[in-house]
Regions:
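Active-site and adjacent substrate-binding regions of carbohydrate-active enzymes
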Residues: 1-287
Length: 287
C-alpha cells in the first residue's frame, strides 16, 4: 500500500464476507459440532423422514445463484450447509457475534497496513430472514413460508436473504468497530436486492453504514430471465432508472455509476455494435 500511496494511488480491497471458501480453516473447524466454530455457518439437518444426502432431503427448496440446490451435504458433520453461490462458498452465519468479531478484526488488520477501503462483495446478503426460533423459510417447522419452486425445481432465496432485517444493524456495527476514528477511507457495497430508496438510507452519512452501493436495476432490466438473453435496449427506461437513482439521493447519500462488471456481458456487445471494427470503436467511445 505504501508504494501505491507514493504514486498517488488509493488501495481498495475486494472484501468477501458473506461467505468463505469451503477450504477455509473456519469451515474445516465448523464441521465438528463440538468446535467453537460449529455455529459459524448455516448448518441444518436433513428434512425429517428423508435420507441425508439424497435428493429431497435438503432443509428447504432454495436454489443457488449458480444452479442446483443452495444446500450441500457434509458427511463429516452429517448436516447440510447453505451456499447461495458455489458449494465451495459456504455462507457465514452473521447472527453469531463471534463471526462478526472475526470479520471486523480482519478488516482492521488490513486497514492498519495501509489499505484505503473495501469493495464489499454481495454485502447485502449477510442478514437472512428467520422465524422467532431461528428457522429459515420453508425449513421443517418454520413459521415462514417459502416461495413456489421455479422451472428448475428450486425456490428463490433472494427475497429472504437480500437487504435482510438486521442488515442496517450489522453495517452500522461494522462502521463503528472498524472505521471509527479513521479518515480517508472508502466503503462501497455490492448490493443485490437493494432499491434506490434503500440506497439513500444506507449511504446517508448520518446513518453510519456504507459510503456507496452498486445497484443493479439498470443492468438487469433488459434481460429475459437471465443475463445471457438480453432484450433490445429500452433507452427511455434506462434513463428513467438512472434518474431514479439520482433522485433518491438528492438529499443525502451517493449513487454509483457503472454499465457493467465481471458478472455482466461486455457493454459494447450488449448495448453497442461490435459487428465490425468501426462500429465497435464508435460504440466503445459512446458508452
Amino acid at each position: 500500500a505504501g508504494r501505491g500511496h507514493k504514486r498517488g494511488l488509493k488501495i481498495v480491497m475486494d472484501l468477501v464476507v458473506n461467505h468463505t471458501s469451503d477450504e477455509h480453516a473456519w469451515f474445516e473447524a465448523s464441521k465438528n459440532k463440538d468446535d467453537e466454530h460449529a455455529d459459524w455457518y448455516w448448518w441444518r439437518p436433513a428434512r425429517p423422514g428423508t435420507t441425508a444426502g439424497e435428493p429431497g432431503a435438503e432443509p428447504n427448496q432454495w436454489g443457488s445463484y449458480f444452479g442446483g440446490s443452495a444446500w450441500e451435504y457434509c458427511p463429516e458433520r452429517g448436516e447440510y450447509y447453505l451456499h447461495q453461490f458455489s458449494k465451495k462458498q459456504p455462507d457465514l452465519n452473521w447472527e453469531n457475534p463471534a463471526v462478526r468479531r472475526a470479520v471486523y478484526d480482519m478488516m482492521n488488520w488490513w486497514l492498519d497496513r495501509g489499505v484505503d477501503g473495501f469493495r464489499m462483495d454481495v454485502i447485502t446478503l449477510i442478514s437472512k430472514r428467520t422465524d422467532l426460533s431461528g428457522k429459515l423459510p420453508g425449513e421443517y417447522g418454520s413459521e415462514l413460508d417459502d416461495l413456489p419452486v421455479g422451472e428448475e425445481g428450486y425456490s428463490n432465496p433472494n427475497p429472504f436473504c437480500a437487504d435482510g432485517p438486521r442488515q442496517d444493524e450489522f453495517l452500522a456495527e461494522m462502521r463503528r468497530e472498524v472505521f471509527e476514528g479513521r479518515e480517508g477511507f472508502l466503503t462501497v457495497g455490492e448490493a443485490p436486492g437493494v432499491t434506490a430508496q434503500r440506497n439513500e438510507h444506507i449511504t446517508d452519512p448520518g446513518n453510519g453504514e456504507l459510503d456507496m452501493l452498486f445497484l443493479f436495476e439498470h443492468v438487469d432490466f433488459d434481460c429475459e430471465g437471465t443475463k445471457w438473453k438480453p432484450l433490445p435496449l429500452d433507452l427511455p427506461k434506462f434513463k428513467s432508472i438512472m434518474a431514479g437513482y439520482q433522485a433518491a439521493v438528492k438529499n443525502a447519500g451517493w449513487a454509483s455509476l457503472f454499465t457493467g462488471n465481471h458478472d455482466q456481458p461486455r457493454v459494447v456487445s450488449r448495448w453497442g455494435d461490435d459487428s465490425s471494427e468501426e462500429s465497435r470503436v464508435r460504440s466503445a467511445k459512446a458508452l
